[in-house]
Amino acid sequence: MNLKKIYLIIYIISFSFLLGDDVSFRGKTSEQLMSQPIPLAFTNMVMNNYNILPSQINPQRGTFLIIAPDGIIQYLGDFVSFKNSQGFDVDVIALSEAGESASLIKSTIANKLAEDPMLEYVLLLGDVDGFASFPSFYYGPENDVSDQKYTHILGDDNIPDVFIGRLSIDSLSDLAVIMAKTMQYVKNPLLYDSDWLSRGLIVAGNYSNSYPIPITPKWTSYWLRDELLNYGYNQIDTVFYPPVQQGAPYIIPSINNGVGIVNYRGWGDANGWHYPEFHTDDVNDLNNGWLTPVFFSWVCNSNDFANNVDPCSSESV
């Protein structure tokens, strides 16, 4: 396995705004939540929306469900052991058992939640086509892809009942590299550089193809830079348009040097960021080894893993 560059995988997690006066966690009352364990990842949501004190609930590490194409399961042993070492109970279900349509897979997740109220995370393995095909849901006139519907199980609200992620792999090599990166990031992230997690990179572009030209991408990015420095980061690199149009010559060295977080806000699509430019082809010039940052890309289609541009920006990173 070539570890010259460890690819970042973006766990595409479904976020929902908790709106209204009747927000509930899986339809539970506060009395029910205080009388039984709850999955650890939902602790803050439960406390904030039920006005429950930390001493009144019993959050515990829950169940980590993996659903994978049948031919992938034999390669998951080390990753399953790793998740067990983090305190998770891990269940692995073959895609042939879960069902080969999105609606059937959602029913499998719902049945698992009914059997195991400590279900916390669901990990889907595979792209929507190709080597490890794994279906998803599509929305709107542009047929945008999203796994969020898998998380809407109980009630008619938009609140996720589980957290979900997808490893959009196109080969066994992709899978091996992603699993190695994930385990190394948790077990010994500072092995090769003791300071890299205290550095960050913020990229932004104030651009529009019509007036008025937005100003908030750079404004919010200046705010984020200050927030990170106040939080304890030692160095935040910035690459902004204007004045920089060709961003890759500045972005690549910053990432190769090691940064814990990369954030972009501006103008882009599945090909990557356009102002300043950093596209899927530029990813091949990254040589950051085990120093794999968390990427945030707040622009249309950069995470569209079903786009005709394949791999999309996030998949290539």
Task: Give residue ranges: language-model regions.
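Generic cytosolic/nucleocytoplasmic N-terminal low-complexity/intrinsically disordered segments
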Residues: M1-K4, Q148
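Cysteine-dependent hydrolase recognition
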Residues: D21-V317
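Sec-dependent N-terminal signal peptides
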Residues: L3-S16
